[in-house]
Amino acid sequence: MLNDLYHMLDPVAISAGPITIYWYGLAYVVGALLTAVVMYRTQRRWGFNITIDDLTSVVVGAVFGLIIGARLFYVVFYGDGYYWTHPLEIFATNEGGMSFHGGLVGGILGGIIVCRMYKLDAWTIADLAVIGAPLALCLGRCANFVNGELWGKPTDLPWGVVFGGTAGDMPRHPSQLYEAFLEGIVLFCILQVLSRKKPLLPQGAFMGVFVMGYGIVRFLVEFVRVPDAQLGYLLGGVITMGQLLSLPLVIAGLVLIIFARHRNRPQCIYLDA
């Protein structure tokens, strides 16, 4: 069934004359909007009242940071030296090549800059952002599936998908959809449940759960996902670059949770609140 679905899909969502809009680009836009909506609704449920202008500024700043960070991390960690001899192609984001790990770092830095400008508490803003972020991750992974990229290893399971092209004619794990479900839907549900606990979890706790949860899921899914062709397996063939970058996330997430509990600072939106 998944195989039939894949072959019915087109990476191009809308094509009208010279205008072409891809599902991958739509995933970024809709993902950012959904994250903003979840942030707004969650902070209202917590009893806060961030202005729409401030929220919009934070989301825009974080998205810009995310795109820059995602691209730079891919160039540095996955490019295998290619971009040092083809520097202009660093800007060719339409050809793919984005790293979640870099997007996370860039998004955080972009968000922090805007928070300082508007005197927002970056810890609470980050917590609010990660409660909605799994929805964006889910859409992004679904777009990867539509594009026929980041596919998994060969499988004889009934939901295997023949991606064709460089993936060959053998059924493969739809690893993109595994991630869409686990780091998207499952992680979103976990964070939603935690966001409704009374009393509220302290600042940094949600960020810790998100980072650790993503790291665990990504590390495990990498076992059935084909590594980037230009890198293959690292450290003697035992680990992928994705796993190598995800292990620090698991550790950082755990440290954040412990730090949040020890610090035990209540959530607040504005620094002068």
Regions found by a protein language model. Give the residues of each.
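A feature for loop-to-transmembrane-helix boundaries and adjacent hydrophobic helices
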Residues: 1-273
